[in-house]
Regions:
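N-terminal Rossmann NAD(P)H-binding glycine-rich loop of SDR-like oxidoreductase domains
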Residues: 6-26
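Short beta-strand element of Class I
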Residues: 29-31
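N-terminal Rossmann-fold cofactor-binding loop
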Residues: 33-38, 55
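Conserved catalytic-core motifs of eukaryotic protein kinase domains, centered on the activation segment
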Residues: 43, 83-91, 127-132
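Rossmann-fold cofactor-recognition segment
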Residues: 45-57
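NAD(P)H-binding glycine-rich loop region in Rossmannoid oxidoreductase-like domains
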Residues: 55-94
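Conserved Rossmann-fold NAD(P)-dependent oxidoreductase catalytic core, especially the SDR/UDP-sugar
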Residues: 75, 101-133
């Protein structure tokens, strides 16, 4: 039986490593993507790979997904620091929105049958008046 594959986009932080550890215990094959392969993570396993990925490059995304047939994709990339997000609004918009959008477009256009989780804060939507429908 083939192992289920989880791709953790931007998974070198605390949350990504925690997800990877949990899923490795459940016998998943894990692919963590990062923009910087120099960043070291303290996790080694025969079912874990670290891949460099440009989240704005649809061909790289498509190749990764087609090659690995993910069961689930976690999108953890992007700016997570509120202080930094206000200092570099364009980069925050690019990484948090456009990067996620590119991933979703590839999933849709290539008909990748997977679960998708975007870990984000409701703060990204700003102040909402009334109920969300």
């Amino acid at each position: 039986m083939n192992k289920r594959v989880a791709i953790i986009v931007g998974g070198t932080g605390q949350f990504g490593i925690s997800i990877a550890k949990l899923l490795l215990k459940k016998s998943y094959k894990i692919i963590i993507t990062t923009r910087n392969l120099k960043k070291k993570i303290n996790l080694k396993d025969k079912n874990l790979k670290i891949n460099k990925l440009n989240i704005y490059n649809k061909n790289q995304i498509k190749n990764l997904f087609k090659k690995n047939n993910p069961y689930i994709i976690f999108f953890l990339a992007g700016q997570s620091s509120p202080v930094k997000s206000f200092k570099s609004k364009k980069e925050t918009y690019k990484s948090n929105f456009l990067g996620c959008k590119k991933i979703l477009e590839v999933i849709k256009n290539e008909k990748i049958n997977c679960k998708f989780l975007n870990a984000a804060s409701s703060e990204m939507f700003g102040k909402i008046n009334g109920k969300i429908k």
